[in-house]
Amino acid sequence: MAFVLSLLMALVLVSYGPGGSLGCYLSQRLMLDARENLRLLDRMNRLSPHSCLQDRKDFGLPQEMVEGDQLQEAQAFCVLYEMLQQSFNLFHTERSSAAWNTTLLEQLCTGLQQQLEDLDTCRGPVMGEKDSELGKMDPIVTVKKYFQGIHDYLQEKGYSDCAWETVRVEMMRALTSSTTLQKRLTKTGGDLNSP
């Protein structure tokens, strides 16, 4: 597990870069919060990974969309924002409170909320008047379906400890992928297909 955490931390550290390419300032704090959120998710581990193998599931993380080169700036920004919002919604529930260490869960929710607030400063400049249109675009719908699948899985499994552990691991994967998108947003201006 220490190797996995080290690998995740290395991925996040590589994603540090100067902000400001979006016509607004994506603060360094956004990346620091991302790293801290991954660390908190790792610390929330309560069960041996081997004890929940029967509950593993492929939730269909739209990884090629998050890590690939197919999104323009506004789309990428919206996907990142939606992933963080849905992650916050997932962990900011009564059922989630019953499953996790309250202190760690509150810290995670605070970190996710901080990332959302940092991104809110860029919503206007990036999205402009297109806000309502972008909410209906395919990448956002894909992210919403992905998270709906996670909610459905938890309900189907009765919000069991193993179900939550499976979701915790999946959220580490999703948030790690979202750091790739954050990195691209801080390094490019306008067209995410640029080198």
From Swiss-Prot:
Tissue specificity statement from the Swiss-Prot or TrEMBL entry: Constitutively and exclusively expressed in the mononuclear cells of the extraembryonic trophectoderm.
Pfam family, one: Interferon
GO biological process, one term: female pregnancy
Disulfide pattern: 24-122, 52-162
Molecular function in Gene Ontology: cytokine activity; cytokine receptor binding; hormone activity
Major location category of this protein: secreted
Signal peptide: 1-23
Top-rank lineage group of the source organism: Eukaryota
Gene3D superfamilies: 1.20.1250.10
Subcellular location: Secreted
InterPro entries per the UniProt record, alphabetical: 4_helix_cytokine-like_core, Interferon_alpha/beta/delta
One CC-aspect GO term: extracellular space
Entry keywords, A to Z: Antiviral defense, Cytokine, Disulfide bond, Glycoprotein, Hormone, Pregnancy, Secreted, Signal
Glycosites: 101
Family classification: Belongs to the alpha/beta interferon family. IFN-alphaII subfamily.
Known role: Paracrine hormone primarily responsible for maternal recognition of pregnancy. Interacts with endometrial receptors, probably type I interferon receptors, and blocks estrogen receptor expression, preventing the estrogen-induced increase in oxytocin receptor expression in the endometrium. This results in the suppression of the pulsatile endometrial release of the luteolytic hormone prostaglandin F2-alpha, hindering the regression of the corpus luteum (luteolysis) and therefore a return to ovarian cyclicity.
PANTHER family for the chain: INTERFERON OMEGA-1, TYPE I INTERFERON
Note: IFN-tau genes are intronless. They evolved from IFN-omega genes in the ruminantia suborder and have continued to duplicate independently in different lineages of the ruminantia. They code for proteins very similar in sequence but with different biological potency and pattern of expression.
Name used for this protein in its record: Interferon tau-10
Organism: Ovis aries (Sheep)
